[in-house]
């Protein structure tokens, strides 16, 4: 059975009082019968504080970024061993904002992906097309390029990882892919991975990240190849985030 996951990406939002209140509220509202693995990804400086606020084990902590070296003269960066020290379970790699604003290319994303795996954490590989790429019929070409970029290390590379489809045109815009549009791409990703390793493809968790909210989550999560969500803005509101989590069957 595939792991169901809902992850909240808080991006560069919140200060210490806000993040501690937010995670405490989420934990209080989440309940004990949650069908999904719930993760929160605060700004890196607050990871230890958020980890220390958790009381029940119903929520895990993740990181928004990592640098693909264990240590060295990389001013301002954080390595996987550092993140693991604070019990991070998941790490985002390849988020569209990192690709766009920090010019991270496929090779660099692949290095991050394998660095995270090598240190026993789970990378969430983010893939997705821009509006112009979609309008020019290049969606599958772009997705394949981004997914296959991490496959150079062999047929087991998609074991113990998550892939998040985040159409760039839907992030922070209020727009979202229809459930059917999202399902089509999720199925394409699973089939693509299946060409490398059929068993891993069947067990691969695929989540959707593109303006997920409490109004569209149930329809999205009902699709056969959508196993959860990567939630941005709505994850900054405890009630909204938990409503999304509860849409997981």
UniProtKB/Swiss-Prot annotation:
Which GO terms of the cellular component aspect does the record hold? Answer: cytosol
Q: Under which EC number(s) is this enzyme classified?
A: 5.3.1.1
Chief subcellular location equals cytoplasm
Read off the Gene3D superfamilies from this record.
Aldolase class I
Which amino acid positions bind substrate, per UniProt?
9-11, 172, 211, 232-233
Q: Where in the cell is it found?
A: Cytoplasm
Q: Name one Pfam family in it.
A: TIM
Recorded hits in PROSITE patterns, A to Z, give:
TIM_1, TIM_2
What catalytic reaction does the record list? D-glyceraldehyde 3-phosphate = dihydroxyacetone phosphate
What residues make up the catalytic site? 95 (electrophile), 166 (proton acceptor)
Instruction: Identify the metabolic or biological route this protein is part of.
Output: Carbohydrate biosynthesis; gluconeogenesis; Carbohydrate degradation; glycolysis; D-glyceraldehyde 3-phosphate from glycerone phosphate: step 1/1
Give the record's keywords alphabetically. Cytoplasm, Gluconeogenesis, Glycolysis, Isomerase
Q: How does the annotation summarize its subunit structure?
A: Homodimer.
**Family to which the UniProt record says this protein belongs:** Belongs to the triosephosphate isomerase family.
Q: What does this protein do?
A: Involved in the gluconeogenesis. Catalyzes stereospecifically the conversion of dihydroxyacetone phosphate (DHAP) to D-glyceraldehyde-3-phosphate (G3P).
Q: Which NCBIfam families match?
A: tim (TIGR00419)
Q: What is this protein called?
A: Triosephosphate isomerase
Source organism (scientific name) = Legionella pneumophila (strain Corby)
Gene name as annotated:
tpiA
């Amino acid at each position: 059975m595939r792991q169901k996951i809902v992850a909240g990406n808080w991006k560069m939002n919140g200060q210490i009082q806000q993040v501690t209140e937010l995670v405490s509220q989420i934990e209080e509202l989440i309940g004990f019968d949650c069908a999904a693995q719930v993760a929160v990804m605060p700004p890196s400086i607050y990871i230890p504080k958020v980890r220390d606020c958790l009381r029940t084990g119903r929520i895990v902590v993740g990181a928004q970024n990592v640098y693909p070296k264990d240590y060295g003269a990389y001013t301002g960066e954080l390595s996987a061993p550092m993140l693991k020290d604070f019990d991070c379970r998941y790490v985002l790699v390849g988020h569209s904002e990192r690709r766009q604003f920090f010019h991270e290319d496929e090779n660099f994303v692949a290095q991050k992906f394998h660095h995270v795996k090598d240190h026993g954490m789970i990378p969430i590989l983010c893939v997705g097309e821009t509006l112009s790429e979609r309008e020019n019929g290049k969606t599958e070409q772009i997705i394949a390029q981004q997914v296959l970029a991490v496959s150079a290390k062999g047929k087991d590379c998609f074991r113990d990882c998550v892939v998040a489809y985040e159409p760039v045109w839907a992030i922070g815009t209020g727009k979202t892919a229809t459930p059917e549009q999202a399902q089509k791409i999720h199925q394409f990703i699973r089939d693509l991975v299946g060409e490398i390793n059929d068993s891993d493809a069947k067990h691969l968790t695929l989540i959707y990240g593109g303006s997920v909210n409490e109004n569209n989550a149930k329809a999205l999560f009902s699709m056969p190849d959508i196993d959860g969500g990567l939630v941005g803005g709505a994850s900054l509101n405890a009630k909204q985030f938990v409503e999304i989590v509860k849409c997981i069957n």
